């Protein structure tokens, strides 16, 4: 007995192991079968809920059957097959389709009333072959127009759209027949023109779209010469969608004119202008900075009577004013007093109004010269902390130094140059000439301990006196830098002058006028290296010497 029991136990254990070894193979087969079924029928998956609707494709049996019925009805009414789906879908919906849809809606409402209000409509839709009312209309058009726009269907993916346009298996669906690209092109046509076209041919109301009208419509862009084709065909979408009309003709109906009117707010219009349109902006010049620069080159006149002294500090800190009579800039009374233009000098105790501007351009001319191209004597010297600044890392101390420590700013702040506080000797930068200031003779005195810049010059005083004559003699483009005041042109020019005067003394009274003219032409330029007192003394001594030489020669 014990042997039999042990034998049975061993048999059952071996059988269990055999079944356990066979079990994974059955599970794998089930998984592969399920995956195969899901991969094959993933596009034909039927939901158990009857309320879910499946949007048809051009290859579905419902859509194909409906199109076959539609073609059968149209062929029965029109034996000559003069109706075109292109004109039907793009311009006017057919009247018979609207009537058929209304009849179908009435029949379905009667069926729902006959079934009773207790039964929900979801239970009644057990047949999946039944089609919806809006099965051929896109959802956006359903929300806007209801069921008034037939013959529209939904394509689920771009691959289906490509196959639908090119590789359609059915004979009735191809690129030239009911493409979804042509169905949204619906335009409201002239109802009066449509009525005229129908009343002219009362016997052919069903044959509204004939072959002649269709050919004229497609060939002449809706502009038919014959009077019988006028009416609904005179207003076609082809003349409005033409790309040549859209891009090449600046008509008032072009989309570029209406692009700015899409947004009613100024902020929206600014955004639209910043984004830009695909159309050319011919009237807008992209180089407005050069235009402003050319306008700023005009001469400056003094018109101190028209401006009060109260507004003198606030004028020309914005855009310079212009007079009505002459298109010239107006100078303030402060300019006449200080003999310095406010275009080249900022007001004291004023915030930095400069900064990066989108219209700033780089002018590679003789006006703006970089600091590396100047002479060694005109390069600004650093302050007492120059050794510490140069030795240490610039990136570590850049933000601690302040704005006055930046040596090469594109728009330097002039407040530091005009500041009266002499407690801290800051780095002085030569003031760059602004737009229109072509005669700024600014320089740096390297000998003076205060390391300041002298702004008064001979040309600046001449500019403040009145308007410069355009036809006059142009000033010299070079400047004499004087190293010693007492020996101004003594070795070369004075000796040549005395020799010329001695040679011309025997000529008589006729040559005396020439020497006077020559002596009057020898005008010394104002020295930037001396103070005002030394300048006046040097001028007096120079005049006395020249007068003495002239007196001796005479």
From Swiss-Prot:
Induction conditions: During S phase of the cell cycle. Expression is cell cycle regulated by HCM1.
Ranges where the record places region Disordered: 1-31, 98-117, 410-475, 493-554
Biased composition (Polar residues): 411-427, 539-554
Location relative to the cell: Cytoplasm; Nucleus
Modification after translation: Phosphorylation of Thr-319 by CDC28 is required for the interaction with FKH2 and recruitment to promoters.
A GO cellular component annotation in the UniProt record: nucleus
Keyword hit for Nucleus: yes
Domain of life: Eukaryota
Keywords, comma-separated and alphabetical: Activator, Cytoplasm, Nucleus, Phosphoprotein, Transcription, Transcription regulation
Modified residues (Phosphothreonine): 319
Native organism: Saccharomyces cerevisiae (strain ATCC 204508 / S288c) (Baker's yeast)
One example GO MF annotation: transcription coactivator activity
Biased composition (Low complexity): 98-113, 448-465, 493-513, 525-536
Name of this protein: Nuclear division defective protein 1
Role noted for this protein: Transcription activator involved in G2/M transcription through its association with FKH2.
Subunit structure: Forms an activator complex with FKH2.
Gene this chain is encoded by: NDD1
Positions with biased composition (Basic residues): 466-475, 515-524
Lineage of the organism: Eukaryota, Fungi, Dikarya, Ascomycota, Saccharomycotina
Biological process according to GO: G2/M transition of mitotic cell cycle; positive regulation of transcription by RNA polymerase II
Further facts: Present with 779 molecules/cell in log phase SD medium.
């Amino acid at each position: 007995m014990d042997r039999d029991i042990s034998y049975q136990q061993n048999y059952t254990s071996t059988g269990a192991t055999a079944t356990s070894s066979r079990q994974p193979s059955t599970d794998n087969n089930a998984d592969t079968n399920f995956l195969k079924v899901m991969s094959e029928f993933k596009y034909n998956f039927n939901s158990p809920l009857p309320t879910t609707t499946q949007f048809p494709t051009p290859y579905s049996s419902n859509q194909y059957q409906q199109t076959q019925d539609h073609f059968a009805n149209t062929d029965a009414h029109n034996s000559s097959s003069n109706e075109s789906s292109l004109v039907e879908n793009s311009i006017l919906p057919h009247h018979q389709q609207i009537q058929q849809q209304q009849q179908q809606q009435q029949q379905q409402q009667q069926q729902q009333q006959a079934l009773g209000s207790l039964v929900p409509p979801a239970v009644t839709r057990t047949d999946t072959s039944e089609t919806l009312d809006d099965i051929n209309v896109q959802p956006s058009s359903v929300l806007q127009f209801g069921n008034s726009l037939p013959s529209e269907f939904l394509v689920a993916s771009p691959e289906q759209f490509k196959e639908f346009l090119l590789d359609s298996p059915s004979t009735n669906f191809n690129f030239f027949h009911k493409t979804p690209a042509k169905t949204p092109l619906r335009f409201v046509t002239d109802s009066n023109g449509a009525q005229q076209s129908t009343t002219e041919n009362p016997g052919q109301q069903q044959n509204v779209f004939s072959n002649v009208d269709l050919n004229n419509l497609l060939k002449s862009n809706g502009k038919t010469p014959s009077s019988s084709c006028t009416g609904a065909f005179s207003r076609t979408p082809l003349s409005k969608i033409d790309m040549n009309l859209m891009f090449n003709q600046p008509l008032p109906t072009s989309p570029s004119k209406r692009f700015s009117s899409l947004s009613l707010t100024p902020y929206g219009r600014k955004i639209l202008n910043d984004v830009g349109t695909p159309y050319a902006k011919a009237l807008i010049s992209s180089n407005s900075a050069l235009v402003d620069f050319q306008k700023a080159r005009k001469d400056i006149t003094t018109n101190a009577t028209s401006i009060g002294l109260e507004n003198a500090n606030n004028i020309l800190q914005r855009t310079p004013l212009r007079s009505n009579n002459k298109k010239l800039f107006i100078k303030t009374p402060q300019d006449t007093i200080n003999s310095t233009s406010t275009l080249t000098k900022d007001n004291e105790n004023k915030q930095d109004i400069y900064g990066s501007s989108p219209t700033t351009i780089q002018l590679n001319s003789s006006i703006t010269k970089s600091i590396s191209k100047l002479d060694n004597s005109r390069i600004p010297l650093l302050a007492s902390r120059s050794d510490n600044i140069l030795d240490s890392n610039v990136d570590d101390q850049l933000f601690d130094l302040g704005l006055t420590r930046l040596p090469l700013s594109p728009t330097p702040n002039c407040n530091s140059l005009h500041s009266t506080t002499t407690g801290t000797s800051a780095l002085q930068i030569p003031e760059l000439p602004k737009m229109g200031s072509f005669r700024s003779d600014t320089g740096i005195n390297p000998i003076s301990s205060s390391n300041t810049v002298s702004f008064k010059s001979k040309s600046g005083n001449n500019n403040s006196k009145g308007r410069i004559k355009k036809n006059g003699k142009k000033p010299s483009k070079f400047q004499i830098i004087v190293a010693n005041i007492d020996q101004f042109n003594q070795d070369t020019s004075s000796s040549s002058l005395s020799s010329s005067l001695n040679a011309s003394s025997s000529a008589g009274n006729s040559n005396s006028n020439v020497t006077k003219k020559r002596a009057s032409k020898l005008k010394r330029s104002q020295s930037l290296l001396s103070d005002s007192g030394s300048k006046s003394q040097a001028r007096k001594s120079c005049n006395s010497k020249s007068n003495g030489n002239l007196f001796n020669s005479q």
